[in-house]
Amino acid sequence: GADLHSTAVWDEEKGKWILNGEKWLISHTDCSQFSYVICVTDPDKKGDDRLSAFFVPMDKPGFELVPMPHMMGCKGAGHAGLKFTNLKLDPIYLLGEEGQGMKVAMHSLAVSRVHIATSNLGISQRMFEMSIARARDRVTFGKPIIKRQAIKMKIANMQMMIHALRCLVYDFAQDFDIDQHNDYIDEKAAIAKLFSIDTVRLVSDEMLEIFGGDGYFEDSPYGPTELLYRDCRAMWLEEGAPTVQRITIAKGIEDH
């Protein structure tokens, strides 16, 4: 989460870092062999300087996967909690230098956030295409609903948001390819992720209205509307909630 409480204390006698703490709602734990963890290594310091990053093999003694309640969507993502109890790490497992944890985190988060934005783009495009097909086939009062002005407004809004999101994702990808360490990467990644949430939310809501009751069935004959509607809700939270994205964007503007 955004509030970091896990700690790593240097044991001078043993020459190892000792990790204690918990991380909640971690994805893909069912197929991973390692994780990277941001810990407080110097509580006396303020701000980002107190944080460090570690590479943590998941077979280390003191590492525990904590089962989570079943989620309403993303059934195949393998979510779990991580618990560290006096987990010992040699110095080679420190990523970068001590005090660089936030730098490591933000660099990886920028890529992960755009992965989420790209996923939302794909989900939105799929829902849009399904909505167009259904609007052409669904007939009310003698004509397809795609001919009705209210439905046209929905379709236009969906297309507008999807096109804008695609431009944001491509813009980030271009900048990242040119220089992945430029000063605007974190800010642009947060913008893309945040806008992708607004996009997938609007598109999923409009899709459900276009499908009507048929879109609310688990086994709808017209496509996986219910599954997509549930799965895309997880995107609000992954790699930082909307409020965290706004803080990142504002901080980028302030720093520049």
Roles of regions detected by a PLM:
Residues 60-62, 73-75, 98-100, 221-228:
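Short, surface-exposed loop/turn microsegments at beta-strand edges and helix-strand junctions
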Residues 22, 87, 213-214:
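Well-ordered beta-strand scaffold positions
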